[in-house]
Amino acid sequence: MNPNQKIITIGSVSLGLVILSIILHVVSIIVTVLVLSNTGTGLNCNGTIIKEYNETVRVERITQWYNTNIIEYIGRPSNEYYMNNTESLCEAQGFAPFSKDNGIRIGSRGHVFVIREPFVSCSPLECRTFFLTQGSLLNDKHSNGTVKDRSPYRTLMSVEVGQSPNVYQARFEAVAWSATACHDGKKWMTVGVTGPDAQAVAVVHYGGVPVDVINSWAGDILRTQESSCTCIKGDCYWVMTDGPANRQAQYRIFKAKDGRIIGQNDINFNGGHIEECSCYPNEGKVECVCRDNWTGTNRPILVISPNLSYTVGYLCAGIPTDTPRGEDSQFTGSCTSPLGSQGYGVKGFGFRQGNDVWVGRTISKTSRSGFEILKIKNGWTQNSKDQIQKQVIVDNLNWSGYSGSFTLPVELTKKGCLVPCFWVEMIRGKPEEVTIWTSSSSIVMCGVDNKVANWSWHDGAILPFDIDKM
């Protein structure tokens, strides 16, 4: 075959393949039209299939139009209603573990923040652990000196409850060295206190956006709860202190809606001292159990009504629950006055159950070690010493720290009452241990209908870390 014949043959074959391809495409179109015309209303040219995927960072709506996908990013749907939170507390027979973050153990080899003052608060959909970071990581040189309470590096951040305070899952909330946070059913509200001691400012964030501020009115370390604030029917309440930690200070209740302050009221408490209140909703009011850092080894009690009227006094029970404290047998109890001369103190909590009260305290009378919760019959209203239940959470061979309260809303549990819960901070490092840093992890417990065995859910990290040996 000469070259011309080869060219003609190749051209003929190519032309034949092109014609065959055109025929196949025509047949494909005819078959598709015939099939679609026989499917009735099941599929039509104007029909679409829409699928929505609720991802962590966005909601995707994927529209499938036969063999074509159109991806559209849409806004995350917001909750429509405020939480009620006017129900009574559920009766608790014991407290079961809800979560434990093991942050310090994980932080020996993971990217975990140096923190203090962790606390838990819940929305209708989830509970989150909030914490004050030191702007540094465990086992890193910047963790040196983090025993200090107030610095420009401290921030309020949060993770889903049970997660360690790690850099990959933490969400920024506010610049703060003192804070509170709560959810009204629609959005999170946070209050972060920062700035110099004499001119500190509290910034109120709502839905992640700063919307209001509170300036220091006494010029002496404006500070707040270090635990969950309380929202009832869309109004959120919290307590702040401004003034000395070891003598008479000034105390105020604040009320906000959608992050904007709509009311405040001074608390008249001459001779008494209020710090770091642990508050919860109960029967339409806010009940708080606080810290007396001046003289009392009994805890201040504050009950707030929606109109910002209040009653204030001390937990009546004849058993002291602050630290340091004296012997139980030597304590008489008072509903109106501070008792004891120990000074100092530690953040704590309690829950009213009718006239009875559940109260938490360190097991040690002199240091922040061990933790137990007691139920005292008639302890809310009388100087009762009648301990009807006790549960150990951390044994006295291990460090504890702050503790505080929160509740599980009925929207989350589908119960007709608010489940009482608490958290216990377990402080590690300075000043009790030979490290360059101070941080903490936490255990979280919630009320159940059964008694729960004693155990020790302690921190468990083996110290010192590598950074402490350099």
Swiss-Prot record:
> What are the positions of the active site?
D149, Y402
| Region listing for Head of neuraminidase, in residue ranges | 89-470
List residues traversing the bilayer. Answer: 15-35
Gene Ontology BP terms: carbohydrate metabolic process; viral budding from plasma membrane
Q: Where is this region: Involved in apical transport and lipid raft association?
A: 11-32
Cellular component GO terms, alphabetical: host cell plasma membrane; membrane; virion membrane
Q: Which family does it belong to?
A: Belongs to the glycosyl hydrolase 34 family.
Question: What is this protein's name?
Answer: Neuraminidase
